[in-house]
């Protein structure tokens, strides 16, 4: 658990590893998936709270946002703490002294701002022993809380605990590692480290030469990265082990993964390690395979057992690697992951293999099989980051599901030696996720109990019925936003399903969805939804982008339609928080009920706003000509051919020039020209056409999210893209 103030020691500890890594060729590129990918990187933005773990963002039951991070340094006077931050989102959160400085009222030694007693008396701490003859380690165990989850049944906070214990076990400069889990029943003020979760396959006793008879030992399992998967109902934990030269330092780093049903709440015995292609080994003491990318040298995604670490093998690390008895550092070491809804894939960002390097991204479509493919890297943007995490840039509170553009955070040893920063990363694809629905149809949204979502008659409220009645208020139309999220409009009223996105009330468990017109500039983040497939049933969860909560329906009083945390089990605790909610309440089927109102617009049309038609001035055939509006005259330069795309957007080509309506330069800026250009299929030539309340349509650029807008009702008014103001100059009739 090296920190910014401990870098000199860290550098010495890792020197042998870096020297060995420098002599190892970089891994071969992964076999290309069916799609091709592009990775764009924005300008770095400082992150002002870097420390010795990644930040772990989460939302409490009342909608309050938190993130948590820790440090546990080795010297007698060095800091050891579990810190908590709170605020509107990641950008505004500040350290909560009420939680971070809390002291256990039953034990004055048990503190969040000094975890020395807690770590030494935890399940791992009581098994640990102090270093002998090594003054650098003042304690027998150092523990970091990292990886948070809030129990939907009780509201209790859970977290995984990384232990570094029994330091210098063979007279070296390292230690053993293990992962425990902890629970807080008072919103983080006091904690109980309950038990082991994931531990080494090998002995962690000091000087155990029977287990480690030769030149090396394994320091065990640590540096966990938790992912709570809404699709499968499992926790997945990516973690690492290191192979240490006795009397020296670590010289190799291996990657592993374990999983447990979320319903088991991190308990000992619920975890299974990935070993030899199966979830077959217990989390505590079980064997584990080293993970590698699927590429020309591996089709399985893991190191064969015969080539993985075995303490019975003699020789140094480099000798074992040369003999094929040990893999080199895994390219997937301590990988944090997220679900990218635009790609329809899980993506991961591991630690660099050979020091400072571009950040690599890997992807898989199935966490059950753990086959990760390299899809690209950040090019000129490089770092040697110790700690990384994802965040959806639209909500700035959630790391579980992200859109096409997301934040990639770095803490410690970032680009140019920065201690902390993030960049906006955009992963483009030649084959993004296919829409799970036909956007030309309307759908009935029903849960596993058969209840049907409806807009309440004459109201902005939503409700659910025990069975469908055939009312149009029970039908919903999905429109892709172009970034992996969708807006969901009631087929009868055209209003969008959502939750308030301006306060924590919209994130609170049980928040009731309502319908409303789109916000200024388009759907608010509370009116955006991710459609996440449920792998076990073939159904879906609708995850609200603002809150991270999922849509559920119930016959219980007061919760006919609500948003709650993902669950794959039925609450049996008796707690009012869980309220006996079941998985069936939020596992949804989407059944077509007919065509979406207005139907598809494929074919030739005119477009008019404020009585003036969209016009290709002077019958131009020149790419780059800015479009205008003009008195309708029936000319071919005022005819536009709509071609529907697979995501529901339209390519709009002039009937005379055959050139496409195009946001000039793919600009995201308000006021950018809308021109005609050779049709390329780019997102800046795709337009989302949506019925507007009060009549007409909005025509929104898929690339920028801004609306097709004419400057005035005068002939020759120039057409640009602008934020949605509700103006008649942005409301188009389609003839």
Q: For the regions a protein language model found, what residue spans apply to each?
A:
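Beta-rich carbohydrate-recognition and catalytic domains
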Residues: 32-141, 150-157, 161-212, 230-233, ...
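Secretory targeting and sorting signals
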Residues: 1-31
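Beta-propeller and closely related beta-sheet repeat lectin domains
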Residues: 53-56, 142-149, 222-226, 333-336, ...
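Lectin-like carbohydrate-binding module/patch detector with strong preference for beta-trefoil
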Residues: 433-735
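Short coil/turn segments at the loop-to-beta-strand junctions that recur within blades
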Residues: 200-203, 379-385, 634-635, 681-682, ...
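Short aromatic loop motif centered on NTY/YTY
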Residues: 208-216, 221-225, 385-406
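Short, surface-exposed tryptophan/glycine-enriched loops
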Residues: 226-228, 393-400, 532-537, 690-691
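Conserved hydrophobic/aromatic positions in well-ordered beta-strands
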Residues: 180-182, 258, 338, 360-365, ...
């Amino acid at each position: 658990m090296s920190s910014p103030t401990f870098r000199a020691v860290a550098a010495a500890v890792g020197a042998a590893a870096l020297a060995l890594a420098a002599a190892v060729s970089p891994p071969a590129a992964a076999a290309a998936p069916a799609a091709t990918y592009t990775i764009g990187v924005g300008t770095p933005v400082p992150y002002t709270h870097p420390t010795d773990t990644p930040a772990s963002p989460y939302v409490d039951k009342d909608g309050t946002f938190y993130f948590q991070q820790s440090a546990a340094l080795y010297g007698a006077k060095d800091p050891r703490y579990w810190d908590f931050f709170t605020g509107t989102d990641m950008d505004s959160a500040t350290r909560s002294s009420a939680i971070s400085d809390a002291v256990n009222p039953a034990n004055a030694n048990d503190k969040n701002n000094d975890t020395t007693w807690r770590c030494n008396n935890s399940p791992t701490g009581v098994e640990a022993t102090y270093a002998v003859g090594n003054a650098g380690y003042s304690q027998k165990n150092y523990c970091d809380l990292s990886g948070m989850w809030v129990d939907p049944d009780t509201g209790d906070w859970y977290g995984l605990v990384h232990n570094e214990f029994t330091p210098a076990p063979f007279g070296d400069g390292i230690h053993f590692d293990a992962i425990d889990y902890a629970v807080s029943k008072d919103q983080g003020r006091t904690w109980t480290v309950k038990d082991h979760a994931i531990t080494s396959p090998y002995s962690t006793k000091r000087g155990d030469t029977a287990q480690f008879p030769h030149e090396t030992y394994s320091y065990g399992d640590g540096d966990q990265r938790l992912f709570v998967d809404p699709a499968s109902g499992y926790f997945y934990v990516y973690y690492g082990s290191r192979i240490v030269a006795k009397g020296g330092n670590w010289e190799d780093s291996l990657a592993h993964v374990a999983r447990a049903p979320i319903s088991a709440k991190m308990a000992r015995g619920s975890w299974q390690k990935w070993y030899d292609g199966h979830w077959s080994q217990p989390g505590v003491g079980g064997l584990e395979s080293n993970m590698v990318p699927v590429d020309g040298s591996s089709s399985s995604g893991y190191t064969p057992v015969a080539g993985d670490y075995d303490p019975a093998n003699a020789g140094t690390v480099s000798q074992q690697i040369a003999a094929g008895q040990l893999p080199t550092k895994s390219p997937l070491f301590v990988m944090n992951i997220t679900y990218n809804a635009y790609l329809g894939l899980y993506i991961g960002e591991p630690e660099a293999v050979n020091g400072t390097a571009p950040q690599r991204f890997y992807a898989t479509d199935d966490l059950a099989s753990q086959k990760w493919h390299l899809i690209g890297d950040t090019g000129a943007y490089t770092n040697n980051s110790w700690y990384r995490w994802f965040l959806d840039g639209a909500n700035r509170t959630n790391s579980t599901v992200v859109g096409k553009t997301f934040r990639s955070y770095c803490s410690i040893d970032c680009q140019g030696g920065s201690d902390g920063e993030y960049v906006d990363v955009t992963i483009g694809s030649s084959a993004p996720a296919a829409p799970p629905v036909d956007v030309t149809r309307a759908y009935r949204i029903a849960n596993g109990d058969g209840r049907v979502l409806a807009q309440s008659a004459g109201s902005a409220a939503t409700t659910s019925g025990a069975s469908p009645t055939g009312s149009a208020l029970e039908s919903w139309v999905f429109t892709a936003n172009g970034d992996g999220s969708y807006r969901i409009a009631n087929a009868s009223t055209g209003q969008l399903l959502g939750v308030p996105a301006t306060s924590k009330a919209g994130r609170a468990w049980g928040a009731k969805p309502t319908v409303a017109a789109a916000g200024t500039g388009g759907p608010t983040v509370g009116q955006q939804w991710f459609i996440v497939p449920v792998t076990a049933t073939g159904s879906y969860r609708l995850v609200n982008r603002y809150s991270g909560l999922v849509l559920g329906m119930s016959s219980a009083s007061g919760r006919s339609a609500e948003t709650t945390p993902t669950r794959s089990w039925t609450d049996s605790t008796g707690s009012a928080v869980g309220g006996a909610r079941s998985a069936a309440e939020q596992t949804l089927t989407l059944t077509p009920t007919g065509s979406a109102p207005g139907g598809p617009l494929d074919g030739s049309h005119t477009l008019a706003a404020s009585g003036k038609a969209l016009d290709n001035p002077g019958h131009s055939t020149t790419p780059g000509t800015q479009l205008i509006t003009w008195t309708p005259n029936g000319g071919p330069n005022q005819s536009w051919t709509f071609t529907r795309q697979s995501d529901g957007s339209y390519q709009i080509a002039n009937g005379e020039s055959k050139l496409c309506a195009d946001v000039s330069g793919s600009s995201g800026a308000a006021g950018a020209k809308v021109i005609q250009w050779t049709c390329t299929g780019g997102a800046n030539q795709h337009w989302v056409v949506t019925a507007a309340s009060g009549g007409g349509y909005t025509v929104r650029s898929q690339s920028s999210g801004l609306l097709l807008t004419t400057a005035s009702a005068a002939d020759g008014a120039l057409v640009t893209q602008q934020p949605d103001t509700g103006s008649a100059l942005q409301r188009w009739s389609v003839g």
